[in-house]
Amino acid sequence: MSTTSMQDLLRTLRNRSSIHQDGLEIVDKSIPDVSTPGTLDPRVREVVLTQRPSVSIPEGASPVELARAGMGWDNEDMTTRQISTDVLSIPRPDTTIEARLYRPEAARPLPLVVYFHGGGFFGGTLETVENPCKALADKGNVAVLSVGYRLAPEYPFPTGLEDCHASIDWAVEHADRLGIDPGAIAVAGDSAGGNLATVCCLLDRERPTPYIRYQVLYYPVVNVGEHPNSEYDWTLEAYDRQTEPELLERIILSLQDEEGVLEQWYVQASDSKDPRISPLFATLDDLPEALVITGEFDYLRLEGEAYAKKLARAGVKTRYLQYRGMEHAFLDKLGLYPQAEDSLDEIAKDLKRLFSQTN
C-alpha cells in the first residue's frame, strides 16, 4: 500500500464516533473505505483469502512447535526517527529472561510502557512485536520494554505471569540505568499479553503505592476456559455477518479450539477461574486507567467488551475501541492494516495526556 493511501485511510479513521454508556467511553472505528455493516475490511479479506505467513516448520515438530510456527507476521517498521534498541537480561530465580528496550532520542527520564506479547501463553516472540513497540516509542515519546517471559507448556502458570510482574519491579529498580521515570509506568499487551498486563495491574494494586498508571489491553484473554459468567454470553449471533457469512464465521471461530489448548498447556494443574488466570472474575476496583481494544470479528471480542464494561462499573476510567472489519491479532499487521497504526496513535495520545508531555 502506498504511503499516500495509508495516510488517507488513517485520516478517515481519526474521524470516529464515541458514546458514553454507564461510565464507559465507547469508540466505534468504522472501516475507512467501506460503509456496509457486517463487512470484513478489504485488507483483512485479501490476507485471509490469498496470503499466508512464511513459516519454517522443523521436521518431526511437536504440536507445540507447530502451533508456535504458525504465529506472527512480517510487519513493517513505521518509525519516523531513530529508535534505539537495547537487548537486556532480567534476572529470575535460576535463570534470566530476555527483554528489549526501545527508546527515542529524547530528553530523559522517559515514561515507560512495559509490553507483553501475545501467543496464547505458549507462543509469540519479541520479534513479532518489535515494530509495534518501536512505533509506540516513537509516537508516544516513551521508552518501551518488551518482555520475553517464559512460555507454557514448559513453564505453566504462574511462571510467565511472575516473569512479567518481576520485570516491572526490575525496571523501577533500574530506572536511572534505563533512563525512565519510575513514576510514569504503563503496561500493555495483546491477546494473552493483554491478560498478563491487566493481571499485573491486579498484583500491583496490592502495593502500598502502585507503580502502574495506565493499561492497554489489545483483544485480551480474560476468561480462560470460557466459564459461564454474569458478564456476557458468547454467541455467534452477536456478530453482524451481513456479507460473506460463511467466511466471517470461519474467521470468528478460528480461535475457538484454542481454549482447550490454554487449559492443557498454560493452566495445567491450576484453576482457570483463578482471577490471576481469568481476570474477568477479579474485583476490579482501584485499577489504573484502561484502554481496551478489540476487532469486530475476533472470537475474543465479547469477553473484551465485557471486561471493559466491568472495569467502568468498578470506577476505573476506561475507554473501549472497537475496530470494525478487523480480525484477531490485527496489531501484528502494522504497515498493512491502517487500524494497527491508528490504535498506536490512540495510545500515544493517552500517554502524552497522562504523563504531561507536550511533544
Role assignments for model-derived ranges:
Residues S2-I19, S35-T36, S84-R100, P104-N359:
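Alpha/beta-hydrolase superfamily serine-hydrolase fold, recognizing
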Residues M1-T79, N359:
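N-terminal targeting or regulatory segments adjacent to alpha/beta-hydrolase or S9 domains
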